[in-house]
Amino acid sequence: MGIKQHNGNTKADRLAELKIRSPSIQLIKFGAIGLNAIIFSPLLIAADTGSQYGTNITINDGDRITGDTADPSGNLYGVMTPAGNTPGNINLGNDVTVNVNDASGYAKGIIIQGKNSSLTANRLTVDVVGQTSAIGINLIGDYTHADLGTGSTIKSNDDGIIIGHSSTLTATQFTIENSNGIGLTINDYGTSVDLGSGSKITTDGSTGVYIGGLNGNNANGAARFTATDLTIDVQGYSAMGINVQKNSVVDLGTNSTIKTNGDNAHGLWSFGQVSANALTVDVTGAAANGVEVRGGTTTIGADSHISSAQGGGLVTSGSDAIINFTGTAAQRNSIFSGGSYGASAQTATAVVNMQNTDITVDRNGSLALGLWALSGGRITGDSLAITGAAGARGIYAMTNSQIDLTSDLVIDMSTPDQMAIATQHDDGYAASRINASGRMLINGSVLSKGGLINLDMHPGSVWTGSSLSDNVNGGKLDVAMNNSVWNVTSNSNLDTLALSHSTVDFASHGSTAGTFATLNVENLSGNSTFIMRADVVGEGNGVNNKGDLLNISGSSAGNHVLAIRNQGSEATTGNEVLTVVKTTDGAASFSASSQVELGGYLYDVRKNGTNWELYASGTVPEPTPNPEPTPAPAQPPIVNPDPTPEPAPTPKPTTTADAGGNYLNVGYLLNYVENRTLMQRMGDLRNQSKDGNIWLRSYGGSLDSFASGKLSGFDMGYSGIQFGGDKRLSDVMPLYVGLYIGSTHASPDYSGGDGTARSDYMGMYASYMAQNGFYSDLVIKASRQKNSFHVLDSQNNGVNANGTANGMSISLEAGQRFNLSPTGYGFYIEPQTQLTYSHQNEMTMKASNGLNIHLNHYESLLGRASMILGYDITAGNSQLNVYVKTGAIREFSGDTEYLLNNSREKYSFKGNGWNNGVGVSAQYNKQHTFYLEADYTQGNLFDQKQVNGGYRFSF
């Protein structure tokens, strides 16, 4: 086989050795196989051999080399070439195994010492264990080349592979497993290792890959390490995944993974040039950073993910240290940090550039920073998303550093009170700078402490949090918003606020009740909407009242809208005034987006001097005082009559208060509708010869209630039905006593909405019909009314309320018919009078907007005096009565009041009216009576149109 061995054995000697070591030799003795088959058929040989030494070594496929020879230092080795300029040529074929176990010294697997040597193998396995140290493969000779093919494995209890002196090594699907030492060490200029695809390096106690072009001839170029789909998994204190020193170039291809587990065990530590795509780095030890660059440029492409359980994600710290961490919109990168920061630039020329990256920091409540620039470091970001848990800060710059952000920016802190963007002042340093421009979604506060912060918020931006600018060290906070929203969560101040079609909302965030915010702005410009809240009541009647406040200390410009939130639960009186905007120049213009409902009254915004204030609609502003004029010489007094005082303006109720207060009118009018005349209830009872009646009537119409007091008018359609029966008590006395029940349904339309009302009632009556034309009618009624309404407030929010009240009434009616014909038939006149007393209980409603509406009870005494002109025709057992009527009505009582959150408003039903009507009552066969009436009432407080019809059966 032409094998040159360290012990100089011949072929015969080799066979003798095989006789001992190989079971194949036993087959020769029995003639099973020939000698030529053993010599010339290597597929049948899996030989064990000892240490191999020389310049030309060839090992058969599948052979096993066991280190049994020591080098001059007394250390066992497996394969070794001599040192010097004589190149070695080592061919280890396929599936060869090299085992070295030095129980007392330094175990060496394969040592290539000759210059320009070569090592070839495929599916090679090297397994070395040494007492003091071990090395799997050591390529010492200058310009040595090793090709380890596919699927080779190096196992060592110390170092895996050391290569230097501008040598090269290639392999694919390569495995290094070792403890204590470094998995792969690449030294010197020009040294190159290419591990192809699918290789794996596992170490326990030290670094996975070390590369440093620090020695040798720099003309040979940088040291290089190349791999793709590489896995590095290391354990131990300061055990780095890859340690890249100066003059080194590392290309990790695509889908490589680095895992470390140990304190200070960084994933990638670099002073050189590193590139990777779809890189995963996962480090779990204390103070272990994912990627730390101390020099050179590290470029990490799309779909890369860095996770550090207790350290930083990315950090640059050193001269011209640069990290480019570049994801794409389709394949975003990510950083997770459970330690100090997500990404950090920590020295004057250190830079971190990121694109399309999601950053999460969570240190279990302790301080952590999403982006951290310090000591002159610079961070740039394009389309970043930062999520900060409790205790974290989103973006932080200090000690003359700079952060520049563009495109979409998301900063989501766990609460709006946490710092989303902040600078820190440090004595002796220039102000740090943070610039952001793009569409922003920020949940957190922005604080300029001795720094310069500029936010240019593009359309669709939303910021929820507060702001602070302390103006130390020339620091400023300038914000420009275009079609964006700022939800102000607490007292804030900034230097410049330039708004274009944007909203500043003091009210959207769920702050503590009664807690308001003041926004101090030095310079305001543009056009915007400010959404605000107000407690105009304060300690009562406006004393020490408060609300959200916009305070402009410098220049103001533009046209702005104030949208002040309605608050129905406010116990207002309509006399309060509250300043909501303060300016020094009064140059900007502010107007209300709508009237404001506070309690039961409407408020508006007006300018007073250079400020704007909230006041109850209808009140007159206090005049701005003029300077006292220079006194003129005394003149004789001229006495003028006092001018006629103008009516004092009154506050206007809200739509909710109006609908609630108007239920006084609804209840009053329902009573009016239900308590009608005897003719309307039962038709003409004269010439009645029967003992009893059963009757049914229905009615319907419309009412228009006029504005009165502070209540606006409304109209109401209604319909109802009554059913009753009576019995004549005696043949000699025409007195009928009966019972009835009824129900009325109404649909009031208010100025701000509509509602429903229902009255269910029952009662009894006694009617007396004398032969001389006199009659009287007594009616007693008890009722229960239910009311509900739905209105839109001044800001188009729906408001609902409902309530129930009981009432009773007593009505006494009397009249006398005078026939104008001696026959007793034909034309007649009939004067009538009626007096109705009603009592309505109090009622309380709480509207859905918080307004409490209390309607006091009231008494009503309604009088009516009417005249009927009719024509009566009798034919056999039938009778027809046609009539017209007219009369006056008057409310003698009806004083009441209603309370809007305990603010009293008086109301009265007193007034006069005129009632006119036409009707017919037809009796057939002295049993069946049909009656119909239409009438119209015109009064001071309401108008009514009604049609009434019924049927009576007499028995």
Curated annotation (Swiss-Prot):
The Pro residues compositionally biased stretches are 622-652
Q: Keywords of this protein's UniProt record, alphabetized?
A: Cell adhesion
- GO annotations under biological process? cell adhesion involved in biofilm formation
Cited InterPro entries: Autotransporte_beta, Autotransporte_beta_dom_sf, Autotransporter_pectin_lyase_C, Bact_Autotransporter_VF, OM_autotransptr_brl_dom, Pectin_lyase_fold/virulence, Pertactin_central, Pertactin_virulence_factor
- State the deletion phenotype: No change in cell adhesion or biofilm formation.
Q: Which organism is it from?
A: Escherichia coli (strain K12)
> What do the Gene Ontology cellular component annotations say?
outer membrane
Where is the region Disordered? 616-659
**What is the taxonomic lineage of the source species?**
Bacteria, Pseudomonadati, Pseudomonadota, Gammaproteobacteria, Enterobacterales
Q: What is this protein called?
A: Probable autotransporter YcgV
